[in-house]
Amino acid sequence: MWVMVLYDLPTETKAMQKAANLFRKRLEDDGFSLFQFSIYLRHCPSRENAEVHKKRVKMMLPKYGKVAVMTITDKQFGDMEIFHSKVREDPPPTYQQLELF
């Protein structure tokens, strides 16, 4: 399971710039990685864990701007086609889910 955060935050004033940088820093502190500009991804081992991280994102929302949070399955993530300058790239590696008995 992957949690994807997409955002568009205003940076017109120093306070808005600070809020946008703080939001980005908090995403990174919570284990999210930059996928594209204003798009961060985090792998979660289960749906329950993904919900925990979605709640954390909701708690750190800045006052202004747009933020979208979505979850995608490992299968959907693996089916993603990524291109860089018309050259196809492999998506970031997915993680092996360990089963404990």
Curated annotation (Swiss-Prot):
GO MF entries: metal ion binding; RNA endonuclease activity
Any Gene Ontology biological process: maintenance of CRISPR repeat elements
Keyword annotations: Antiviral defense, Endonuclease, Hydrolase, Magnesium, Metal-binding, Nuclease
Cofactor: Mg(2+)
Entry's family note: Belongs to the CRISPR-associated endoribonuclease Cas2 protein family.
NCBIfam families linked: cas2
Name by which UniProt lists this protein: CRISPR-associated endoribonuclease Cas2
